[in-house]
Amino acid sequence: MEEGKNWIVPTWRVPGRRMERWHSLVKYLKYRTRDLEEVRYVPHHKVGWAWWTCSRVIFPLKGESHLEIQAYWNLTPEKGWLSSHSVRITWYTERFWTDVTPDYADILIHSTYFSCFTAGEVRRAIRGEKLLSCCNYPQAHKVQVPSLQYLALVVVQQNDRPQRKGTARKQWRRDHWRGLRVARQDYRSLKQRGSEPSAPRAHFPGVAKVLEILA
């Protein structure tokens, strides 16, 4: 009798409802804002023989390397091993490949995608001038020892944002959602006329936060 073979890989459990949000965010950043234009998104129906794979998202990185986030589904939750969804995060280089944590995946993604503070921002902050750039991926810095320059720029960036309380906050929310509705209407009308508007640069909340990864 032939023995059964077990396939063991490190995975991170993900609530099922988060998987759809992950796919939507990747497609939005790839096709709408173009922040992830070079990223390859492979849905389940294009994966091929790996029926347990829900999707593959491949991030080309600097040099001859890339990061792959592979989502799995139908992983025997009835036996108590895993929830029905999980992801595997793998870093491939020329010489080796290894599984990495979501925190390190954020660092790798931030090294190639999403803007950060430029070198001249410290001088602008000292002179009291307005910052011309910002960090669109702050989650990637949380596992690193931040420099004093970075901490100072974060404080300046936060102080530049207006503080809203009480009725002012409610009014801002109403204006915000009204602006989103107007933007969607303008986008549809421009699309009907055959022109494509440019979307603003997006903030990426981080792999673990988007997927609500469970340890």
Swiss-Prot record:
**Where in or outside the cell?**
Host cytoplasm; Host cell membrane; Virion
Q: What is the membrane topology here?
A: Peripheral membrane protein
Q: Which GO cellular component terms, listed alphabetically, does the Swiss-Prot or TrEMBL entry include?
A: host cell cytoplasm; host cell plasma membrane; membrane; virion component
Q: Which domain of life is it from?
A: Viruses
Q: What is its main location?
A: host cell
Q: What are the entry keywords?
A: AIDS, Host cell membrane, Host cytoplasm, Host membrane, Host-virus interaction, Membrane, Phosphoprotein, Ubl conjugation, Ubl conjugation pathway, Virion
Q: Which residues carry this modification: Phosphothreonine?
A: 98
> Anything else of interest in the record?
Required for replication in 'nonpermissive' cells, including primary T-cells, macrophages and certain T-cell lines, but is dispensable for replication in 'permissive' cell lines, such as 293T cells. In nonpermissive cells, Vif-defective viruses can produce virions, but they fail to complete reverse transcription and cannot successfully infect new cells.
Quote the function comment for this protein: Counteracts the innate antiviral activity of APOBEC3G. Forms a complex with host APOBEC3G thus preventing the entry of this lethally hypermutating enzyme into progeny virions. Functions as an adapter molecule, recruiting APOBEC3G to the ubiquitin-proteasome machinery. Targets APOBEC3G for degradation through the assembly with elongin BC complex, CUL5 and RBX1. Binds viral RNA and affects the stability of viral nucleoprotein core. May play a role in viral morphology.
Similarity field:
Belongs to the primate lentivirus group Vif protein family.
Name of the protein in its database record? Virion infectivity factor
Which organism is this protein's natural source? Human immunodeficiency virus type 2 subtype A (isolate Ghana-1) (HIV-2)
